[in-house]
Design a protein with these regions (language model features):
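Short, basic, glycine/proline-bearing loop/turn elements
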Residues: 55-62, 169-177
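Metabolite-binding pocket within alpha/beta catalytic cores that recognizes anionic/polar moieties
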Residues: 1-127, 131-136
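Flexible, glycine/charged-enriched surface loops at secondary-structure junctions
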Residues: 35-41, 145-152, 237
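Active-site rim beta-loop-alpha module in soluble metabolic enzymes
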Residues: 124-175
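Zn-dependent metallopeptidase/amidohydrolase metal-coordination segment
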Residues: 186-219
Length: 237
């Protein structure tokens, strides 16, 4: 037990899927896992452990933003001996080559947060995800005929849709081709790197400044299910 997780150590699997939304964690457990049980409900940050294709896996919500995922991923890595975390979620994009419903795998995250400085005194703006875990995810996507966009992404402290000027928002970042914008990956990758663990981030793009496509609830669910299945299949390899 930690200040934020009530689970016993044996309740948590070595591999964790981490959606931001607690209700998405519940949805994944109910739809994809067998013999699952609720292992955390503190602050309604739901965690479930069950079996997928006979392999044990935990689905544990992170909440939104680096501070929240920083707490949960650190405690899972440090106190529960979790080896791998695959973040799964949604993202936006201001890349002309990325369309709504594209699935993006982050090669690494650029961020202007002070998380690294406050955690252990470092001052970096970019950190890579785990190459071995990415390799597994890419091979799984190829096997399942899921088109995957692989490249650098941005982790922001501001929800980009609420930025007063999207062009100014974009100008805050380097000119490199960043595929997607989300709010958690940098913190997850940083902690995995410092603690000698593995981390990856899969995202389904749900909004873009270059694509006005409006998703129906059915389209959103189906696209997320594809990403969830990809993450689960990669997690059990």
């Amino acid at each position: 037990m930690t200040p934020h997780i009530e689970s016993k150590k044996e309740d948590i699997a070595e591999v964790v899927l981490m959606p931001g939304d607690p209700l998405r964690a519940k949805y994944i457990a109910e739809k994809f896992l067998t013999d699952y049980k609720l292992v955390n409900k503190i602050r309604n940050m739901f965690g479930y452990t069950g079996y997928y294709k006979g392999k044990r896996v935990t689905v544990f919500a992170s909440g939104m933003g680096i501070p929240s995922i920083g707490i949960y991923s650190y405690e899972l890595y440090k106190f529960y001996d979790v080896k791998k975390i695959i973040r799964i979620g949604t993202s936006g994009s201001f890349n002309k080559n990325i369309k709504v419903l594209d699935v993006v795998l982050s090669e690494g995250a650029y961020c202007k947060s002070y998380f690294d400085q406050l955690f252990d005194g470092n001052d970096i703006n970019f950190i890579k995800s785990s190459s071995s875990l990415n390799k597994t995810i890419k091979k799984t996507a190829e096997k399942e005929n899921i088109p995957l966009k692989f490249g650098k992404t941005i982790t922001s402290d501001v929800f980009d849709l609420y930025s007063s000027s999207k062009e100014k928002f974009k100008d805050n970042y380097p000119e490199d081709d960043y595929l997607a914008v989300e709010m958690e990956a940098f913190g997850l990758f940083y902690l995995a790197n410092r603690l000698g663990k593995e981390a990856a981030c899969l995202m389904t793009v749900v909004d873009s400044v270059y694509d006005d496509k409006s998703l129906t609830s059915e389209e959103r669910e189906q696209s997320l299910d594809q990403m969830i299945t990809l993450a689960l299949d990669a997690a059990i390899i």
